[in-house]
A protein has these predicted regions:
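Residue-level signature of outer-membrane beta-barrel architecture
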Residues: 46-48, 79-83, 114-118, 144-146, ...
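A charged, solvent-exposed segment within the mature domains of Sec-exported extracytoplasmic proteins
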Residues: 110-159
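Residues that define the transmembrane beta-barrel architecture of outer-membrane proteins
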Residues: 25, 36-40, 69-75, 82-84, ...
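Cleavable N-terminal export/targeting peptides
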Residues: 1-24
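Transmembrane beta-strands of outer-membrane beta-barrel pores
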Residues: 31-35, 58-64, 83-85, 92-98, ...
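Repeated loop/turn-to-beta-strand initiation elements of outer-membrane beta-barrel proteins
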Residues: 27, 50-56, 83-88, 118-125, ...
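Outer-membrane beta-barrel "beta-signal"
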Residues: 146, 165-177
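Short glycine/proline- and aromatic-enriched beta-strand/turn motifs that initiate or cap beta-hairpins
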Residues: 18-64, 176
Length: 177
């Protein structure tokens, strides 16, 4: 996971002088896979005022076992600010897991990263801390999208939830407004 992120970071820095503001007005609908299970993913983000944005992200996962499937839902809701290609966001998170019984945990997270693009290609790379279950987890998020037109595109992303949920790959359709 280290090397693709370094390549993405170098691509950001090499095109920083031509980078445009990241387009935060979008909705991603797709599937996720963490190597053990699969599920649906849903993200919606929107500019609010000036360079501020709000974002909600939900990742559902179901892992098959020999007895009963393990179902989990990870979500976070953030408010952020972008200046040039640098962005910061903070908010709350929720982690629900069900096997024979259900547990839910809530916490907070803060992330810092780079976001931008030019033309039809947009990319984002961020890292931060997730406080959940009385522990701190490293969270890394990288995604890229390609727009076919002003309203429709495709998105590909990786979210690394450390030991909490592993590396989750996401592939989906991006709707923009």
């Amino acid at each position: 996971m280290k090397y693709p992120m370094v390549i993405l970071l170098l691509a950001f820095l090499s095109s920083a002088t031509q980078a445009e503001q990241y387009r935060w007005d979008y909705m991603d609908i797709g599937v996720s896979n963490d190597g053990l299970g699969k599920g649906m993913t849903f993200t919606v983000a929107s500019h609010t005022v000036s360079n501020f944005f709000a974002r909600a992200n939900l990742m559902r996962n179901q892992q098959k076992t020999t007895t009963k499937p393990i179902s989990s839902l990870y979500s976070f809701y953030t408010i952020g600010y972008q200046y040039w290609i640098i962005y910061a966001e903070a908010g709350v998170s929720q982690y629900d897991i069900c096997w024979y019984a259900c547990m839910d945990y809530s916490g907070d997270l803060a992330m810092l990263g780079l976001a931008g693009g030019s033309g039809k290609l947009q990319a984002k790379l961020g890292t931060g801390r997730l406080n959940l279950m009385e522990q701190q987890w490293l969270i890394v998020e990288a995604d890229a999208s390609y727009s076919f037109n002003d309203n429709l595109g495709i998105s590909l992303g990786i979210t690394d939830l450390d030991e909490l949920g592993g590396k989750v790959t996401k592939l989906g359709i991006r709707l923009c407004w």
